[in-house]
Amino acid sequence: MSSSSTALKTFSLTNSILEISPQDAIYKFDPDEARRIDQESPWSKDPHFFKSCKISAVALIKMVIHARSGVPHEIMGLMQGKVVGNSIVIMDSFALPVQGTETRVNAANEANEYMVEYTEGSSKAQRPEHAIGWYHSHPGYGCWLSGIDVNTQMNNQKYQDPFVAVVIDPNRTISAGKVDIGAFRTYPENYKPPSTSSSEYQSIPLSKIEDFGVHANQYYQIDVEIFKSTLDNELLGLLWNKYWVNTLSQSPLISNRAYAVSQLSDLHQKLSKVQTSVTTTRAAIPVLQDKEGSASKKEKEEKKKEENQLAKGVKDSTKIAVEAQHGLIAQVIKDVIFSMRPKGDASTAQLSDVTDTAMSIG
């Protein structure tokens, strides 16, 4: 039990889960306030009205478990919650019986019937929160919205706003040890978003880059915050006790082996593509600035573009190496803690050296 508790605390710290009082207003549902907000619909006047998406820890774990169970296929579910200020608050989530592939997920009539029955049952069980978002997984290729996702979210916002789209990458979650999650809202049709600086770099597989870039200006990302109350700890403990043994007994190096291979293959393709466009490293012949100014400027721009692509390749390779080192560190630590060893300081000192070396590299 103590090991399970430690693992749960580590999960909470890694994902920056905030603990709030169970008497906090976030846990209270006011139907009059909900109707007032729906009537005013401030989000219809300001496309950037929502600034954050707050997700309960229970809903988060349910979504992550669901996403992981579907690998390598995508999964889909709905989220229930409410609007508080400029935030969409997710109180609970439930899976949908849908058929997914490695690149998309399709909701059939059975899923729609299940959705209606579940929401009606929630009302009878004194859970009045409405469906306020949907979630699905991107196994191994990051958190963003594809063209199909953008169309789905646009329809949701058009007919049942407020609505939010959440994407989870279960492969990167296992590999990095932190939930890889993103929350998104789409812009209205014919809306031109203001030019913004590029967000934090995200590694996208070469096969998905075109789809990622084409629709990048049709939606925006909002901050994700995770919260829980002291009353949630017991429920989280029950959920965690069921899965923490698998966490200890499995290694991300083995369970995520296919994902690691796909990452290396993708990195090879990216570097090969960059290599074909890299100019010669031989020093350029000096030319007069007034005659060759425009040509020199063009060469600098091309060189900057090449360096940018190479820098992305370096970031991808560093990410792969760090995640592999973290997996090795975890295996060494579990070996030190749980393996039976003869008395003596030699083996312990040797393992300590291995751990220190791995940590210094990672």
Q: What would you call each of these model-derived segments?
A:
Residues 1-133, 139-362:
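MPN/JAMM (Mov34/JAB) isopeptidase/deubiquitinase module and associated MPN-bearing subunits/adaptors
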